[in-house]
Amino acid sequence: MFKKFVKKTSVLAFVSACLACSSPAKKEPKIAKLTLEPGFSATVIADSLGAARHIAVSQQGDVYVKLNNLKDGKGIYCLSDTDRDGTIDKTVAFGDYTGTGILVDQKYLYASSNTTVYRYKLDQNQQVTDVDHPEVIVKGLVAHAIDGAKPLVIDKERNLYVAVASYSDACADETKDGKSCPLLDSVAGIWRFDADKLNQEYSDGEQYATGLKGVMGFAWNDVSNSLYALQHGRGNFHEKFPQYFDATYSATYPAETLYELKKGADAGWPYIYYDHIRHKKLLAPEFGGDGKKEGDSKYLEPTLAFPAHLGPNAMLFYTGTMFPEKYRNGAFIAFHNQSPELHKGFCVAFVPFKNGKPTGNWEIFADDFAGIDLKNPTGPSQHKPCGLAQGPDGALYVSDDLQGTIYKITYNAKG
């Protein structure tokens, strides 16, 4: 009896061991090496996607990533965690065009190439119903080889906003009379369309705001019921006007600027730029400036200014409840570059808001995407934050367009 019992026990143990060996091991989320405030943590949910630009997360938690270079012939990747274990276990790729803009609402996924805005219908589970036949919302957008991205925003009234950057840094070559820039009718602004009307032409749009050299990061603020936009500043002061400026000046100015935009707003490019140290709008040298002369006061005053060359590529107003109260309704900003003035950058910043207005200065929220010491670099940056999105649980997602890494940042008060 005893021998039979031992034999049966051994067989059961052997079978159990074999089953354990044949069952796939649970895949643990990869911890991201970012510097965060206490209580926050970050994981890598995807990597090696390539030029991952803007991102959007559906109410079901699916992460949509827009690529600026095709990967396996596709420009949109949908990443799903179907068993909710914190790791991506399903990937669907579609769209044969590159671009930057992407957003998702209850019924549709919107995505842009540099010339066209597309729309995909979603089913009740917020899955794209037909990946091969998107609807065309806007076509014929101005696109050049430089700064051709078309980021997107939709407001509560179903207006679609498309940012169209200037392909000229200061409109110097295009301005023949030394007084007026002829590009402002077609670029350097934000155009408004109907988010539900098909086959609109660029000319059907309304120029909502102008004088914005290049906007990548912008977002609708539901509290103030207004559009906020971040401008990429110009450059090349000392190279074109060495009689007035040196290399240090070019590294320090102009500020990257945040604006609250109402219909008809004019931020002043190319005629002015902003000095964030003296808090003044200065006349651009192409139009008679010398680094001291002030620009016309009629141009919009920035809501907030940041050091030069940080490259604000995305903006998100946080409406979740996962993060502490301090972050509620505040703005997260993805900085895609670095400030020579501060030796900081390649980070996600935060600006506190209350009643739809900034209530304090900006601070770095998530750092060390670069993976190097920016004061004493030993090589190039490893990652560059480019897109931001909020998940249904309140988690913050960040895309990197250098390696194609997607980060998920969460908060747990217990650490």
Task: Describe the predicted segments one by one.
Residues 389-415:
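Blade-level signature of beta-propeller repeat domains, shared across WD40, Kelch, NHL, RCC1
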Residues 26-38, 149, 166-203, 212-214, ...:
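Beta-propeller domain segments
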Residues 43-68, 311-317, 333, 337:
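Beta-strand-rich domains and repeat architectures in extracellular enzymes and scaffolds
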Residues 62-66, 108-111, 159-163, 226-230, ...:
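Conserved beta-propeller blade signature
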Residues 84-90, 124-127:
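Acidic, glycine-anchored loop motifs typical of Ca2+
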Residues 99, 115-155:
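Asp-box/WD-like beta-propeller blade repeats and closely related beta-sheet repeat scaffolds
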Residues 57-60, 104-106, 154-157, 219-224, ...:
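Residue-level detector of Asp-centered blade-edge/turn motifs that repeat once per structural unit
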Residues 45-49, 92-97, 137-144, 206-211, ...:
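Surface loop/turn motifs at the tips and blade-to-blade linkers of beta-strand repeat domains
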